[in-house]
């Protein structure tokens, strides 16, 4: 476990120069007060009712991005998946739960209350869930994507099958 933590920490530090380079491209300061944040329906890859606010960059393109995700009250499961890029997550409000591995198992997860921070390297198999309204902030180097281990778990596939 200690080796894994060291490896993850090293990766997070390795990505810092890319984030700094992106920040140097900024031409003006940006401030987002809570009432200024524009929430839109979340991407189809996430549970129904999810909302997303893009704060910086474009998560669908190359380059640094920061987004906030809001999960509504109730149990919301995000099945085992990976990301092609490293991801950095801060819990803004509520509790975000994450577990590692190929099978969804809430007993093996870690509850992260507001104020928690988590980063993981590209390709790490994990799953997540919320039980009440939860807001997280994700930052990374795009393009951002989520790849479900079992395509049947991907909400995008369910929407394609709907009449």
What is each model feature region?
Residues 78-80, 98-99, 120, 125-131:
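Short beta-strand His + acidic residue motifs that chelate non-heme Fe in jelly-roll/DSBH
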Residues 72-75, 82-103:
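Glycine- and acidic-residue-biased ligand/ion/polar-headgroup-sensing regions
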Residues 62-83, 111-112, 121-122:
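Conserved short histidine dyad/triad with adjacent acidic residue
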Residues 58-60, 102-123:
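Short acidic-glycine-tyrosine-enriched beta hairpin
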Residues 8-16:
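Bacterial N-terminal signal peptides
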Residues 28-30, 107, 127-163:
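Double-stranded beta-helix
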């Amino acid at each position: 476990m200690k080796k894994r933590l060291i490896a993850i920490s090293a990766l997070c530090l390795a990505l810092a120069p890319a984030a700094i380079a992106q920040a140097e491209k900024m031409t003006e300061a940006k401030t987002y007060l809570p009432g200024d944040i524009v929430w839109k329906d979340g991407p189809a890859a996430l549970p129904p009712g999810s909302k997303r606010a893009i704060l910086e960059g474009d998560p669908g393109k190359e380059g640094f991005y920061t987004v906030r995700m809001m999960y509504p009250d109730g149990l919301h499961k995000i099945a085992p998946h990976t990301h092609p890029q490293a991801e950095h997550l801060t819990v803004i409000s509520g509790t975000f739960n994450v577990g590692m591995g190929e099978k969804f198992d809430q007993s093996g997860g870690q509850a992260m209350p507001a104020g928690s921070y988590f980063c993981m390297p590209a390709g790490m198999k994990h799953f997540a869930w919320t039980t009440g309204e939860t807001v997280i902030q994700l930052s990374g180097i795009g393009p951002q994507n989520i790849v479900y281990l079992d395509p049947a778990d991907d909400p995008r596939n369910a929407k394609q099958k709907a009449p």
